[in-house]
Amino acid sequence: MQQAQEPRPALTIKEIPAPDFPGAIPLDSVDPEPEQWMAMGRDRGVRNVVSAALIPFLPDPAKAASTAVIVAPGGGFRMLAIDNEGFKAAQWLADRGIAAFVLKYRLHSVPRDTDAFMAAMMSTPPGIPATALQDARAALRLVRSRAADWKIDPAKVGLLGFSAGAMVALELALGEDNSARPDFMASIYGPLSARPVPADAPPTFAVLAADDPFFAAGGFDLIARYREASRPVEFHFYEQGGHAFGMRKQGSTSDLWIDQFHAWVKSRGLLD
């Protein structure tokens, strides 16, 4: 008998002061008004991001591989779930020798009032802001340009995105602008509907749950496009997980996604 998942508690949002990240690297954007940080249950989020930054999580040099992963949180391009889909994943990777960098990319403007913001989050999500793509490309170029400083192989820089962040990752990996392709890519509960897969598409790891309320109904024809293009792809379709689970454990097999991603990276020789 299938075990039902426990219902998630209602989410409450409380404004909190912006934390200080001494090692954050600005990505050449201007901040005319302070971004807004929020406590969302046990995790933090941030909205109205207009000044992009890259926040490093570097491994212990004694166990560091030469691989880097840029982590792009989701949030519907109206906020970033920067703890559950950013810092926690980056720290997990750094603990296993992978240099990780959380990308705080620019978003669409949303109401500064909390109640109005919550109402706006219930509306149809906007499309990918051009600034988010600019920030992701800038992040890839920056990590490669400073690869020697961080003891990273500039040919082993991947991009891992959650939900909206996965849409950014997919666009960089598959879009017509190939000026800053990642060397490998992970789409964590991003859309997997069909789109062209170019001949230079990077190896891709993809995750989706059958009960994802946003993207499961769209299917995963993109995986077939990878196969038709003879490009490497690994796809995990979980029975349960929903959407936006990130690093949160739910007692389902989707809890294992990051272990499986790590195993995939290792199997491709990226941790040698």
Predicted regions and their residues:
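N-terminal cap/lid segment of alpha/beta-hydrolase-fold proteins
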Residues: 5-63
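Short amphipathic alpha-helix adjacent to the substrate-entry channel of hydrolases
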Residues: 83-101, 224
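Alpha/beta-hydrolase active-site loop
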Residues: 115-148, 257-260
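Cap/lid segment of the alpha/beta-hydrolase catalytic domain
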Residues: 76-77, 81-82, 104-131, 247-249
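Short beta-strand element of the alpha/beta-hydrolase
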Residues: 65-74
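C-terminal catalytic histidine-bearing segment of alpha/beta-hydrolase fold enzymes
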Residues: 227-272
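Primarily recognizes the serine-hydrolase "nucleophile elbow" in alpha/beta-hydrolase
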Residues: 131-201
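Short beta-strand/loop motif that positions the catalytic acidic residue
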Residues: 206-208
